[in-house]
């Protein structure tokens, strides 16, 4: 098959996405497919004639990927480095290349459904969840409302907009310690744990650096787990134990910063309960094929 692995984009998780896309592209090539790893924002060339026979030189034209930096990318610099200086989310020839493929593998992180909606309009086949479920899953406020309405437990919390922000946590009915996070971010970028009023104010400032809307939740001390779901069925549970601090951007992607154990050491009853909730989440949000 001719496959475009779509990665990068104008997202704070841009670098993480490249690493994901690179691993996917290599695995697909090993299985005999012609694969192009493509940056959705930068695109490829600005000449239509350069697309002729492009899948026959797929590795040559693919994005070259190195390691993941310890800090999130500066998106202003990314935008400034684009050759055509366009504000179009799709780089040159991205739509054309995707239309030439048999399917697009979505390796983007922080995707909110907009690309899926565009691909639906263009008739481009892609992997994973459609536009509506992607948008819901990316929005923590909306997804939490759906979880609670379905009886899926979630931490006590409140949403806040920058325009009506207050640094008085008592107005939210939440006590310290608390977690402050952007509403639609990923990879723990902009996430802080605040233990007092001074840390809370700093946490608000940090979260608002990335987004106009944020979530403030009670801090639940405990272990961290990840549960994948494929075709509605939960996979074995992974426990993630950061060596230091919480599972932030640095600990997620720096080698040796966290210890992962699979299957997690849990009782059978707890394992079944967690897997049940993971399957419920996928069902409530309408997530197709795979989720985590």
Language model regions located:
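Phosphate-binding site of ATP-dependent enzymes
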Residues: 195-276, 281
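A short glycine-rich, hydrophobically flanked beta-strand micro-motif that places a catalytic Asp/Glu
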Residues: 39, 214, 218, 286-292
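Active-site nucleotide/adenylate-binding loops and adjacent lid/helix of ATP-dependent enzymes
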Residues: 1-7, 11, 15, 19, ...
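ATP-dependent carboxylate activation and anion-phosphoryl transfer catalytic cores
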Residues: 1, 6-10, 268-292
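Short Gly/Pro-enriched turn/cap motifs at secondary-structure boundaries
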Residues: 108, 182-183, 218, 282-286
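Short hydrophobic/aromatic-enriched beta-strand-loop microsegments
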Residues: 125-130, 154, 236-237
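ATP-binding N-terminal substructure of ATP-dependent carboxylate-amine bond-forming enzymes
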Residues: 1-132, 136-138, 142, 161-169
């Amino acid at each position: 098959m001719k496959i475009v692995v779509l990665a990068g984009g104008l997202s704070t998780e841009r670098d993480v996405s490249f690493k994901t896309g690179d691993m996917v592209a290599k695995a697909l090539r090993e299985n005999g497919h012609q694969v192009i790893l493509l940056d959705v924002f930068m695109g490829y060339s600005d000449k239509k004639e350069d697309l002729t026979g492009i899948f026959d030189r797929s590795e040559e034209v693919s994005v070259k990927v190195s390691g993941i930096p310890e800090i999130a990318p500066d998106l202003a610099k990314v935008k400034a480095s684009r050759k055509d200086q366009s504000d179009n989310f799709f780089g040159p020839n991205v739509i054309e290349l995707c239309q030439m493929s048999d399917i697009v593998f979505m390796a983007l992180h922080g995707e909110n459904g907009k690309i899926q909606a565009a691909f639906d309009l263009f008739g481009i086949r892609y992997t994973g969840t459609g536009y509506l479920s992607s948008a819901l899953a990316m929005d923590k406020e909306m997804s939490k409302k759906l979880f609670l309405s379905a009886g899926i437990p979630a931490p006590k919390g409140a949403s806040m907009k920058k325009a009506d922000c207050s640094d008085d946590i008592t107005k939210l009915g939440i006590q310290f310690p608390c977690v402050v996070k952007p509403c639609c971010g990923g990879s723990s970028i902009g996430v802080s744990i605040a233990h007092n009023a001074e840390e809370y104010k700093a946490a608000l400032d940090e979260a608002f650096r990335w987004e106009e809307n944020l979530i403030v939740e009670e801090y639940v001390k405990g272990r961290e787990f990840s549960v994948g779901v494929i075709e509605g069925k939960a996979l074995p549970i992974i426990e993630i134990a950061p060596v230091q601090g919480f599972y932030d951007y640095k600990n997620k992607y720096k080698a040796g910063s966290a210890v992962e154990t699979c299957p997690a050491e849990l009782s059978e009853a707890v394992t079944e309960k967690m897997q049940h909730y993971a399957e419920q989440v996928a069902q409530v949000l309408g997530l197709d094929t795979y989720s985590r």
